[in-house]
């Protein structure tokens, strides 16, 4: 048969008052030593770690808030820059249109001035030509009248006389 020495000596369930007393005293001494020398630094280290973690969380929250603020600020600046660029493009377009209209008006005025000058010159030349023509016609009429007065001719003779005189004119000679 198998025998168990622990059970033979009284077993596990037997309470030994001396051993229990010394185990309790040892536990209390160990608890006092740990409380005196180890418990304070451990609690201090845990409190420091908790403070460090809390500061890191607070710092992360502040940095996130700052990043969100900067992002909103950047978006606002981009929007402002886009609006300014659109306004600048609009103003440039207006300036280009104004310059185009000014150049068109100036060109139109210059063309109108040239046309007016040309018309004036044409009118002057026409007036001059008409004056010269009147003078020539007057000279012709006077000359024809003087010839008619000198020679009293019939209609056919008068017509022949005028045609001969016209043929003698300088313009017809050059032709």
From Swiss-Prot:
Q: Which residues cross the membrane?
A: 23-43
Under the heading InterPro entries, the entry gives: ATP_synth_b/b'su_bac/chlpt, ATP_synth_F0_bsu_bac, ATP_synthase_B_chain
Keywords from the named record? ATP synthesis, Cell inner membrane, Cell membrane, CF(0), Hydrogen ion transport, Ion transport, Membrane, Transmembrane, Transmembrane helix, Transport
Q: Does the keyword Transmembrane apply?
A: yes
Mention any one GO cellular component term assigned to this protein in its UniProt record.
plasma membrane
Q: Does the keyword Ribonucleoprotein apply?
A: no
| Annotated localization | Cell inner membrane
Q: Where is the signal peptide?
A: none
Among the Pfam families in the record, one is ATP-synt_B
Q: How does it sit in the membrane?
A: Single-pass membrane protein
Q: Which GO terms describe its molecular function?
A: proton-transporting ATP synthase activity, rotational mechanism; proton-transporting ATPase activity, rotational mechanism
HAMAP family hit by this protein: ATP_synth_b_bprime (MF_01398)
| Entries under PANTHER family matching the protein | ATP SYNTHASE SUBUNIT B (PTHR33445:SF1), ATP SYNTHASE SUBUNIT B', CHLOROPLASTIC (PTHR33445)
Q: How does it assemble?
A: F-type ATPases have 2 components, F(1) - the catalytic core - and F(0) - the membrane proton channel. F(1) has five subunits: alpha(3), beta(3), gamma(1), delta(1), epsilon(1). F(0) has three main subunits: a(1), b(2) and c(10-14). The alpha and beta chains form an alternating ring which encloses part of the gamma chain. F(1) is attached to F(0) by a central stalk formed by the gamma and epsilon chains, while a peripheral stalk is formed by the delta and b chains.
As for what it does, the entry says: F(1)F(0) ATP synthase produces ATP from ADP in the presence of a proton or sodium gradient. F-type ATPases consist of two structural domains, F(1) containing the extramembraneous catalytic core and F(0) containing the membrane proton channel, linked together by a central stalk and a peripheral stalk. During catalysis, ATP synthesis in the catalytic domain of F(1) is coupled via a rotary mechanism of the central stalk subunits to proton translocation.
User: Its family?
Assistant: Belongs to the ATPase B chain family.
- Name-wise, this protein is ATP synthase subunit b
Question: Which organism's genome codes for this protein?
Answer: Anaeromyxobacter sp. (strain Fw109-5)
From the broadest rank down, the organism's phylogenetic lineage runs: Bacteria, Pseudomonadati, Myxococcota, Myxococcia, Myxococcales
């Amino acid at each position: 048969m198998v025998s168990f020495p622990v059970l033979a000596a009284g077993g596990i369930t037997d309470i030994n008052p001396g051993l229990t007393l010394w185990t309790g005293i040892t536990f209390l001494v160990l608890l006092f030593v740990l409380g005196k020398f180890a418990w304070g630094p451990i609690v201090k280290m845990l409190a420091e770690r908790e403070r460090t973690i809390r500061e890191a969380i607070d710092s992360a929250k502040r940095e996130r808030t700052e990043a969100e603020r900067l992002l909103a600020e950047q978006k606002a600046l981009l929007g402002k820059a886009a609006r300014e660029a659109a306004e600048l493009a609009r103003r440039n377009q207006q300036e280009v249109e104004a310059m185009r209209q000014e150049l068109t008006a100036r060109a139109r005025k210059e063309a109108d001035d040239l046309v007016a000058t040309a018309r004036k010159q044409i009118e002057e030349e026409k007036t001059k030509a008409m004056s010269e023509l009147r003078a020539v016609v007057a000279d012709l009429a006077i000359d024809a009248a003087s010839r008619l007065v000198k020679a009293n001719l019939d209609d056919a003779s008068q017509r022949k006389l005028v045609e001969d005189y016209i043929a003698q004119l300088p313009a017809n000679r050059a032709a």
